[in-house]
Amino acid sequence: MSTPSQRTWQFESFYHTIINARDVDETIAFYELLGFEILDDRRSTVWPDDQGAFFGLIPDIKGRAALMRLPADPNGPMLDIIEWQVPRVDFPARSPEVVPRVLAFRVENVKAAFQELRALGVTFTKPQPNEMPEVGIVASAACEDPNGNLIEIIELEPGLRHSKIGTVYREDEG
């Protein structure tokens, strides 16, 4: 097996993630509230015959979809919102004992986003954003999208790539 320095290939960037949707239109509307825009509307696309095999699914898959992106990051990763019609997707009831899919987004001014989104009808998991200055988190909050995915919005201190939670809150190793 080759080592990364010997390879003639490399992963370049994170491209997209698929969000399974109960209702593609409702899901698009939710992500538009968060500031996403449609990059490629695929709600009336007829998928190629071999697409099911590519995903390891039945041959004749069907779905309505849209690629969405954040305007502030035009070349960044996209959300591929898909309402699968064939085969169908199960959406189990949400339980506090089962961790859902979590998508986290950096946000400038989480407190303002929280207030505006709440006024627009978005329900958050807590009545106010969390503040954890000891780990570099200015504010963070979480809500659910229409499909049960947990959406985290986080604002970090300027210059931080990630929070310092792994170094501040650590089990004693002795």
Please describe what each predicted stretch is.
Residues 4-19, 40-54, 85-93:
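Short N-terminal helix-initiation segments at or just after the protein's N-terminus
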Residues 21, 32, 85, 155-157:
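Short beta-strand segments enriched in hydrophobic/aromatic residues
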Residues 9, 57-62, 94-97:
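A generic structural micro-feature
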Residues 1-10, 13-22, 41-43, 53, 66-118, 139-144, 149, ...:
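Vicinal oxygen chelate
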Residues 20-75, 119, 136, 168-169:
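Core segments of cupin and vicinal oxygen chelate
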Residues 13-17, 32-33, 38, 56, ...:
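Intrinsically disordered, low-complexity regions enriched in small/polar residues
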